[in-house]
UniProtKB/Swiss-Prot annotation:
The keyword Electron transport does not apply. Keywords: Endoplasmic reticulum, Membrane, Signal, Transmembrane, Transmembrane helix. Its main location: endoplasmic reticulum. Component of the ER membrane protein complex (EMC). This is Endoplasmic reticulum membrane protein complex subunit 7. One of its GO terms (cellular component) is membrane.
Length: 242
């Protein structure tokens, strides 16, 4: 009897030890399984559309064109008919643009809801609150070839005349020529005021006196008028004497 009990005791000890080992391994396995199930994969969608260049066949330009979604986060390619499909895109707001070295396309913003509903609108960087809806699937039309260079301006006479140095030389000359014709030079008070104002401007004594120049200019014209008047009166008097 005692021998049987001593033979059963090691078996019981082994059973107890194996139960402890299994109980210690189960929480670790449960923890590992809960961590893997916490990482979820959301739904993915696709953006569809068509790019068109008026008057040009798609085969002539689609080989060098690409469809970019948010820069280069998602890249798509054009089919032979100009259509495109960009797959594996999660819900959110994206800027879709067709990039081509020969033609320019305006970018379009596409909003994708969690249920897969699409909404397209123009990209307006100036008025961000302004929303202009576009049809979906996208219909992207080229606005013409891109302008990589600025056209050089041609030279014209207006550029020469509007030069500040030319204006500084021409305007004083026009003033000296046109002012005596506009102002009544026979009025001595007006002449005196003009001479005083010109003397105030002529502060440098090394320069010629402007008032003296104006006096000579006006006196020459007045003397010419007086001489012409006297000659006319002389001729009329001689005619009367005859």
């Amino acid at each position: 009897m005692a021998a049987a009990l001593w033979g059963f005791f090691p078996v019981l000890l082994l059973l107890l030890l194996s139960g402890d080992v299994q109980s210690s391994e189960v929480p670790g396995a449960a923890a590992e399984g809960s961590g893997g199930s916490g990482v979820g994969i959301g739904d993915r969608f696709k953006i569809e559309g068509r790019a068109v260049v008026p008057g040009v066949k798609p085969q002539d330009w689609i080989s060098a064109a690409r469809v970019l979604v948010d820069g280069e986060e998602h890249v798509g390619f054009l089919k032979t008919d100009g259509s495109f499909v960009v797959h594996d895109i999660p819900s959110g707001s994206y800027v879709v643009e067709v990039v081509s070295p020969a033609y320019r396309f305006d970018p379009v913003r596409v909003d994708i809801t969690s249920k897969g509903k699409m909404r397209a609108r123009y990209v307006n960087h100036i008025k961000t609150s302004e929303v202009v809806r576009l049809p979906y699937p996208l219909q992207m039309k080229s606005s013409g070839p891109p302008s990589y260079f600025i056209k050089r301006e041609s030279w014209g006479w207006t550029d020469f005349l509007m030069n500040p140095m030319v204006m500084m030389m021409v305007l004083p000359l026009l003033i000296f020529v046109l002012l005596p014709k506009v102002v009544n030079t026979s009025d001595p008070d007006m002449r005196r005021e003009m001479e005083q104002s010109m003397n105030m401007l002529n502060s440098n004594h090394e320069l010629p006196d402007v008032s003296e120049f104006m006096t000579r200019l006006f006196s020459s014209k007045s003397s010419g008028k007086s001489s012409s008047g006297s000659s006319k009166t002389g001729k009329s008097g001689a005619g009367k004497r005859r």
